């Protein structure tokens, strides 16, 4: 995305220390179900159709081997922020993205 590209160019352009920089939208930490619900709601108003699945249920109903999932997987933006780059709020960026996407889908 544009935000990720800007973050990468910022880190490279400022000669930031070598290392791993988490790069994701800022704002409230949400579950994957919350994010999917926000996408569906913003895209076509049916976010209520997204049904969360607990990790226990996911593992219980999986067919075949399943990769382990972390209990808490929020990314830490502090290293990116320490070199002077602040990621925009993911919910605002989602709204902006869908504004640009909808006309393309209607054609």
Language model feature labels by segment:
Residues 1, 32, 86-90:
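Amphipathic alpha-helical segment in the mid-to-C-terminal domain
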Residues 2, 10-22, 27-28:
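Glycine/proline-rich active-site loop of Rossmann-fold NAD(P)-dependent oxidoreductases
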Residues 4, 23, 35, 80, ...:
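Non-catalytic, hydrophobic alpha-helical segments
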Residues 8-12, 39, 94-101:
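Hydrophobic "lid"/C-terminal helical patch
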Residues 19, 39-40, 90:
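A structural feature recognizing the 12-helix transmembrane core of secondary solute carriers
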Residues 26-30, 34-75:
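Terminal hydrophobic/aromatic helix or amphipathic segment near a protein terminus
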Residues 68-107:
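C-terminal amphipathic/interface module of NAD(P)-dependent oxidoreductases
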């Amino acid at each position: 995305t544009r935000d990720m590209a800007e973050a990468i160019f910022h880190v490279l352009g400022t000669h930031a220390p070598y290392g791993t920089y988490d790069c994701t939208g800022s704002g409230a930490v949400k579950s994957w179900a919350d994010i999917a619900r926000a996408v569906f709601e913003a895209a076509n108003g049916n976010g209520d159709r997204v049904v969360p699945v607990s990790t226990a249920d996911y593992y219980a109903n999986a067919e075949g081997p399943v990769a382990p999932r972390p209990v808490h997987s929020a990314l830490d933006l502090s290293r990116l922020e320490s070199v002077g780059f602040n990621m925009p709020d993911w919910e605002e960026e989602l709204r902006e993205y869908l504004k640009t996407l909808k006309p393309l889908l209607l054609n």
